[in-house]
């Protein structure tokens, strides 16, 4: 489970899921 932010399309572990702009996606597609 990785959080994706609108400002940062790249998966970042530092990004917290606290923001509402967080999406649950699998990194397998990357």
UniProtKB/Swiss-Prot annotation:
<keyword id="KW-0528">Neurotoxin</keyword>
<keyword id="KW-0964">Secreted</keyword>
<dbReference type="InterPro" id="IPR045860">
    <property type="entry name" value="Snake_toxin-like_sf"/>
</dbReference>
<feature type="disulfide bond">
    <location>
        <begin position="3"/>
        <end position="22"/>
    </location>
</feature>
<keyword id="KW-1015">Disulfide bond</keyword>
<dbReference type="GO" id="GO:0090729">
    <property type="term" value="F:toxin activity"/>
</dbReference>
<keyword id="KW-0872">Ion channel impairing toxin</keyword>
<keyword id="KW-1220">Voltage-gated potassium channel impairing toxin</keyword>
<protein>
    <recommendedName>
        <fullName>Dendrotoxin B</fullName>
    </recommendedName>
</protein>
<dbReference type="GO" id="GO:0005576">
    <property type="term" value="C:extracellular region"/>
</dbReference>
<keyword id="KW-0800">Toxin</keyword>
<keyword id="KW-0632">Potassium channel impairing toxin</keyword>
<dbReference type="GO" id="GO:0015459">
    <property type="term" value="F:potassium channel regulator activity"/>
</dbReference>
<comment type="function">
    <text>Blocks voltage-gated potassium channels (Kv). This is the slowly inactivating phase of potassium efflux which is blocked by this toxin.</text>
</comment>
<comment type="similarity">
    <text>Belongs to the three-finger toxin family. Short-chain subfamily. Orphan group XI sub-subfamily.</text>
</comment>
């Amino acid at each position: 489970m990785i959080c994706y932010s609108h400002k940062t399309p790249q998966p970042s572990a530092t990004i917290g899921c606290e923001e509402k702009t967080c999406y649950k996606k699998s990194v397998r597609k990357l």
